[in-house]
């Protein structure tokens, strides 16, 4: 068994028209044993910028803390909010530094540029190789299921409500077909003027 699937979990981000969405499941378990149903996998990295971390739970928390530390230093030094593309480089550097004994987590970044409000999503592998796309990115133990749902449901230029419905259906149906993720879903819809966070009920088994 891969160490990446030891704790389970799923994270997904999607791009809409002038908005992005990021979603994650809420389960923390040890293989098939369920521990808690409110585990945080999505972390704010700015006013309109979030990172989702799927993988080994200890490394999820370690990477989130170390990234927040680097982010605070950056914002103190630069005196401005970080851009999504710069955050991607920061995460890539953090992961690649440990490439010979990597953090077992594959991050997903979603947000809007602080000046232009241009939507941005990307994913990275566990040694920090980035992939920037214009539709959706997925990470976690049920990537095949998530890709299948996203390929079926995603459309270009979705408004925030349509985007919420699409990412919610994709996540809920994907995690239902994976034994080590699920237990509810949390969704953040990021727009120019507001961020909407919704928690979805799912099958609790």
UniProtKB/Swiss-Prot annotation:
Signal sequence, renumbered to the chain: none
Cited Gene3D superfamilies: Glutamine Phosphoribosylpyrophosphate, subunit 1, domain 1
Residues modified as N-acetylserine: 2
Glycoprotein is among the record's keywords: no
Gene Ontology CC: cytosol; nucleus; proteasome core complex; proteasome core complex, beta-subunit complex
PTM sites of type N6-acetyllysine: 77
PROSITE patterns for the chain: PROTEASOME_BETA_1, PROTEASOME_BETA_2
GO terms under biological process: proteasome-mediated ubiquitin-dependent protein catabolic process
Subcellular localization(s) per the UniProt record: Cytoplasm; Nucleus
Subunit structure: The 26S proteasome consists of a 20S proteasome core and two 19S regulatory subunits. The 20S proteasome core is a barrel-shaped complex made of 28 subunits that are arranged in four stacked rings. The two outer rings are each formed by seven alpha subunits, and the two inner rings are formed by seven beta subunits. The proteolytic activity is exerted by three beta-subunits PSMB5, PSMB6 and PSMB7.
UniProt record similarity statement: Belongs to the peptidase T1B family.
Protein name stated in the entry: Proteasome subunit beta type-3
Organism: Bos taurus
Gene name as annotated: PSMB3
């Amino acid at each position: 068994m891969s160490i990446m699937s030891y704790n389970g979990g799923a994270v997904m981000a999607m791009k809409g028209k002038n908005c992005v969405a990021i979603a994650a499941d809420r389960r923390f378990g040890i293989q098939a044993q369920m521990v808690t149903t409110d585990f945080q996998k999505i972390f704010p990295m700015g006013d309109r910028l979030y990172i989702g971390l799927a993988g080994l739970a200890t490394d999820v928390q370690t990477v989130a803390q170390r990234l927040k530390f680097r982010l605070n230093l950056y914002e103190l030094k630069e005196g401005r909010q970080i851009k999504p593309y710069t955050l991607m480089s920061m995460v890539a550097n953090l992961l690649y530094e440990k490439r010979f004994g990597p953090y077992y987590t594959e991050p997903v970044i979603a947000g809007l540029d602080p000046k232009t409000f241009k939507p941005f999503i990307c994913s990275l592998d566990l040694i920090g190789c980035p992939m920037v796309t214009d539709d959706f990115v997925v990470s976690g133990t049920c990537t095949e299921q998530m890709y299948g749902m996203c390929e079926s449901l995603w459309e270009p230029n979705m408004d925030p409500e349509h985007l919420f419905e699409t990412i919610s259906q994709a996540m809920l149906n994907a995690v239902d077909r994976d034994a080590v993720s699920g237990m509810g879903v949390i969704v953040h819809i990021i727009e120019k003027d507001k961020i909407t966070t919704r928690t979805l009920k799912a099958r609790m088994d």
